[in-house]
């Protein structure tokens, strides 16, 4: 089975998967990780050290932090010079297509109906995981073209009077940038972002990053902070 592991409270170290994907690491959950990225990397190093030597760890080649992790068997995925590489990426109005190479050998081509560069990384890492698990990639390829995404991940929730409304749970500056990039090129209309900050600690510690996350947006509306049990 497949599962998404949550690193927010450090309990990720309790798990020992056969195939593990670490997409990217940045300062977050700073209410728990008091030393920021340093603490996060220490937790992930402990997590990796606990998994069996036969396990495969797939890390994002384009993320400096993930590339600093050490494992018994590490493979990389990314846009260039990785074990699994996405090449010839084409963003179109209704889909995204790209070719997948494994160790510079053509493996397959993929079509996804999700937008944004981050979803290329997501799909690439999923395919790499399946390939490492011994699954025939040509058998699973058609399913990538029909997966419409998760709820609250650039989810279309309404359309009226020429306005299209999308809902996304992004609450980290990098996530916000990725979400807003999904709207680029969709049409020539204005992009209005309504943002509710999540946790006072995150807003305080990543303030400068938040200021730069909305560049290119026509209008930003900021609501009250969702405290998530924190005191103001």
Predicted stretch roles:
Residues 1-8, 165-171:
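Switch II (G3) loop of P-loop NTPases
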Residues 2-4, 23, 60, 194-196:
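Short beta-strand segments
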Residues 3, 32-38, 169-170, 197-202:
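Short, flexible loop segments at the rims of nucleotide/cofactor-binding pockets, characterized by
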Residues 8-16, 173-183:
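Switch II of P-loop NTPase G domains
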Residues 9, 28-29, 64-66, 201, ...:
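Glycine-rich nucleotide phosphate-binding loop and flanking beta-alpha elements
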Residues 14, 48, 214-215:
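A short, aliphatic-rich alpha-helical micro-motif
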Residues 150-152, 174, 180-232:
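Active-site beta-alpha connecting loops in nucleotide-dependent enzymes
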